[in-house]
């Protein structure tokens, strides 16, 4: 194993931070270590950690579980700060609201994008200040606006006249961000479509309405779509936002000081390309805005690769060369991302019960396999024609990159309780 791997369930994850990141003040270092910074788990270390959870029977009744790699979260924040050093992330809570994950992000300086009263309450319950929240839902129930005013969440988005009237009535001190619709989000994994964002011809009337209501429009927001593969979409959106700033100035409104560039980021090469496009567009269109605060609403960038899911094989059927397996999580649970987030999942065998001397079945013959979820719906099929070695009931299948829009959107259909899936925390120190 490369480095030490430990279970830290029950520990404040901020306690492992060894440096100040993104302007946050870290909590004290982990006991017996005051100098080393945590790093992502190696593949072998992650496997060893999962095997220890399984063999030590830390999971009751062989239930599915997640591992959250806190070192990966630290690494992702380092990548963000290197690529977009002047842009403060407001993590999109809807993507994955795991409390230890949110606490870790908070300790590293991230703020939070909440879309409902429940999400605001959840973030506040972690001891996070309301001034670190943007209520980034352009269409809110009046009761949620009243609650935001009560607890001091004073920044929100809007894209309609009716929203202006609701905010004027219930939270007139709230600062507003006009949500505009980017013209090019066709390459997003999950495009926003027509649901959100003011069209170009709607911008001036909406600014006039907010001005007449004596509300402060502090800036502009947009979202190019979740998981967008085309970094050029940011170029057009940032140019359009600059046009809104200029329109507000022409109307004699208070100077806009906030630009929210939304989400859509994924880690790795795509982030390198996207961040370069964002920096270029900001330099081109906002180089003269000295008082500008730039924020973003990343979700999957931080969540996707930090979580790994372990599932148990609960059933098996052989039909000639075809192997069919049933596991105890599926499309109505964590793998709902296959349907709603257009995700592609991959599985690695962990033969804890049938082949402990060769856990990954390296060198073993593989078979075309189907993997079903546990519910009685035939739609609940996780993988088809997927090459897997011969596995047995009570072996495990491991799914990496399962942090974005997984457990958060799962259901309890057929009595399989997605919300009950436990998350184990781990981190490693460099060797």
From Swiss-Prot:
Residues with N6-(pyridoxal phosphate)lysine modification: 94
Q: Which InterPro entries match?
A: Ala_racemase/Decarboxylase_C, De-COase2_C, De-COase2_CS, De-COase2_N, De-COase2_pyr-phos_BS, Orn/DAP/Arg_de-COase, Orn_de-COase, PLP-binding_barrel
One Gene Ontology CC term in the entry: cytoplasm
Q: Where does substrate bind?
A: 340-341, 377
Q: Which organism is it from?
A: Datura stramonium
Q: Which SUPFAM superfamilies match?
A: Alanine racemase C-terminal domain-like, PLP-binding barrel
Active site (record annotation): 376 (proton donor)
Q: Does the keyword Lyase apply?
A: yes
Identify the cofactor(s): pyridoxal 5'-phosphate
Per the similarity annotation, which family is this?
Answer: Belongs to the Orn/Lys/Arg decarboxylase class-II family.
Q: Name one GO molecular function term.
A: ornithine decarboxylase activity
Output the PROSITE patterns linked to this UniProt entry.
ODR_DC_2_1 (PS00878), ODR_DC_2_2 (PS00879)
The free-text function statement in the UniProt record for this protein reads: Catalyzes the first and rate-limiting step of polyamine biosynthesis that converts ornithine into putrescine, which is the precursor for the polyamines, spermidine and spermine. Polyamines are essential for cell proliferation and are implicated in cellular processes, ranging from DNA replication to apoptosis.
Kindly list the residues the record flags as site (Stacks against the aromatic ring of pyridoxal phosphate and stabilizes reaction intermediates). 223
Which is one Pfam family of this protein? Orn_DAP_Arg_deC
* Protein's recorded name: Ornithine decarboxylase
Catalytic activity annotation? L-ornithine + H(+) = putrescine + CO2
Which keywords appear in this protein's UniProt record, sorted alphabetically? Decarboxylase, Lyase, Polyamine biosynthesis, Pyridoxal phosphate
Q: Where is pyridoxal 5'-phosphate bound in this sequence?
A: 226, 264, 297-300, 405
- CDD domains linked: PLPDE_III_ODC
């Amino acid at each position: 194993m490369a480095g030490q791997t430990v279970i830290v369930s029950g520990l404040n994850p901020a306690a492992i931070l060894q440096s100040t990141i993104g302007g946050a003040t870290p909590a004290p270092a982990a006991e017996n270590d005051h100098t080393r910074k945590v790093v992502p788990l190696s593949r072998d270390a992650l496997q060893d950690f999962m095997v220890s959870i399984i063999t030590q029977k830390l999971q009751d009744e062989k239930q599915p579980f997640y591992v959250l790699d806190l070192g990966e979260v630290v690494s992702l924040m380092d990548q963000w700060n290197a690529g977009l050093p002047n842009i403060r992330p407001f993590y999109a809570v809807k993507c994955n609201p795991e409390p230890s994950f949110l606490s870790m992000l908070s300790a590293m300086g991230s703020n939070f994008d909440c879309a409902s009263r429940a999400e605001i309450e959840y973030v506040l319950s972690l001891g996070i200040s309301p001034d670190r929240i943007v209520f980034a839902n352009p269409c809110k129930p009046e009761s949620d606006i009243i609650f935001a005013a009560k607890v001091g969440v004073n920044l929100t988005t809007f894209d309609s006249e009716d929203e202006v009237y609701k905010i004027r009535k219930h939270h007139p001190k709230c600062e507003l961000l006009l949500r505009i619709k980017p013209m090019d989000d066709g390459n997003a994994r999950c495009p926003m479509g027509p649901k959100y964002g003011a069209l170009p011809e709607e911008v001036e009337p909406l600014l006039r309405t907010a001005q007449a209501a004596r509300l402060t429009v502090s800036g502009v927001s947009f979202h190019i779509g979740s998981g967008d593969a085309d970094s050029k979409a940011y170029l057009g959106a940032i140019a359009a936002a600059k046009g809104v700033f200029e329109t507000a100035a022409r109307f004699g409104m208070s100077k806009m000081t906030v630009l929210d560039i939304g989400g859509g980021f994924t880690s790795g090469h795509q982030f390198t390309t996207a961040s370069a496009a964002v920096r270029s567009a900001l330099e081109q269109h906002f180089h003269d805005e000295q008082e500008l605060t730039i924020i973003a609403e990343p979700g999957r960038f931080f969540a996707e690769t930090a979580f790994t899911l372990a599932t148990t094989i609960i059933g098996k059927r052989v039909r000639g060369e075809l192997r069919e397996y049933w596991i105890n999580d599926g499309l109505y649970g964590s793998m709902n991302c296959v349907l709603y987030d257009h995700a592609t999942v991959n599985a690695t065998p962990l033969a804890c019960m049938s082949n402990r001397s060769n856990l990954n079945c390296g060198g073993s013959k593989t078979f075309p396999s189907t993997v079903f979820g546990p519910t009685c719906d035939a739609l609940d099929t996780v993988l088809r024609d997927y090459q897997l070695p011969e596995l047995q009931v009570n072996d495990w299948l491991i799914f990496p990159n399962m942090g974005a829009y997984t457990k958060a959107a799962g259901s309890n259909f057929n009595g399989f309780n997605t919300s009950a899936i436990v998350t184990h925390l781990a981190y490693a120190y460099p060797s």
